[in-house]
């Protein structure tokens, strides 16, 4: 949802609006600060202003682009959120420790299924695909032993 009244951020918004008016938009912006100051809201509002079809100093909130931004459904908006980290896992620990027992069991089962697969995976330089029906026609030097 676009919030046009982010409290305490008038100077920041005026700077971003002047950047938009002057067509001097950079390729990336970093919104940084303590929790609760409106970084996410300011970033979404600025993105909405840049994509607005009738921009002034604020997004018009009436065009189709602004309507999509209101519901966070615009194709140019990508919200990236980090996954929470498990505190018990250290960088020096083996990679399998990071997997839950259920995930590890599923991985073992998939590896068993792959082991029973009768087809041999061929890796040839500069070869993108080899139809399965033609694998018996390859030269013996190219077959994996």
Language model segments and positions:
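Clamp-loader machinery-focused feature within the broader ASCE/P-loop NTPase space
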Residues: 2-137
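Single conserved hydrophobic/aromatic residue that forms the stacking wall/gate
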Residues: 136, 141-145
């Amino acid at each position: 949802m676009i919030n046009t009244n982010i409290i305490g951020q008038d100077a920041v918004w005026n700077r971003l609006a002047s950047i938009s008016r002057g067509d001097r938009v950079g390729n990336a912006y970093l919104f940084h600060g303590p929790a609760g100051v409106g970084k996410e809201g300011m970033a979404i509002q600025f993105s909405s202003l840049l994509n607005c079809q009738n921009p002034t100093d604020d997004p018009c909130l009436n065009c189709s682009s602004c309507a999509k931004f209101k519901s966070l459904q615009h194709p140019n908006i990508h919200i990236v959120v980090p996954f929470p980290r498990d505190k018990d896992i250290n960088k020096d620990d083996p990679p399998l420790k990071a997997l839950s027992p259920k995930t590890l069991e599923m991985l073992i089962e998939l590896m068993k299924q792959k082991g029973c697969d009768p087809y041999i995976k061929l890796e040839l330089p500069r070869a993108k695909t080899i139809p399965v029906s033609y694998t018996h026609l390859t030269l013996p030097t190219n077959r994996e032993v």
